[in-house]
Amino acid sequence: MARGSVILLGWLLLVVTLSATLGLGMPAKEKRGWTLNSAGYLLGPHAIDNHRSFSDKHGLTGKRELQLEVEERRPGSVDVPLPESNIVRTIMEFLSFLHLKEAGALDSLPGIPLATSSEDLEKS
């Protein structure tokens, strides 16, 4: 019985040493990059986009609330004018001003600059 125990112990030691040298043991758990929690902990709350603390949340929490906020700020919304529409409106007003100026409709209004350029003024 003692001889069988010695052989079993020797066999187990041999298997353990071979598995350790060949890399057959249990693989170590790999870390796969950053998570939101680790980045938030290391970088601070100001480094994470759309960070909201627990005290800032009113009413619903989570994805539903964020989706409602995104829908309210949608660029095609009627409530919020687009900056591009302001630019387009300004360009359209300027073009209509130039058209009226060419047609002579603005000649009688005071404060409108003349159609002559600075070169024409220097020549005369």
Swiss-Prot record:
Thylakoid keyword on record: no
Superkingdom classification of source: Eukaryota
Keywords associated with the record: Amidation, Cleavage on pair of basic residues, Hormone, Neuropeptide, Phosphoprotein, Secreted, Signal
Protein name in UniProt: Galanin peptides
Cell location: Secreted
SMART domains listed in its UniProt record: Galanin
Listed InterPro entries: Galanin, Galanin_pre, GMAP
Cleaved propeptide residues: 20-30
Expression sites (tissue/organ): Expressed in retinal progenitor cells and retinal ganglion cells (at protein level).
Gene Ontology biological-process entries: nervous system development; neuropeptide signaling pathway; parental behavior; positive regulation of cortisol secretion; positive regulation of timing of catagen; positive regulation of transcription by RNA polymerase II; protein kinase A signaling
Sites bearing Threonine amide, chain numbering: T61
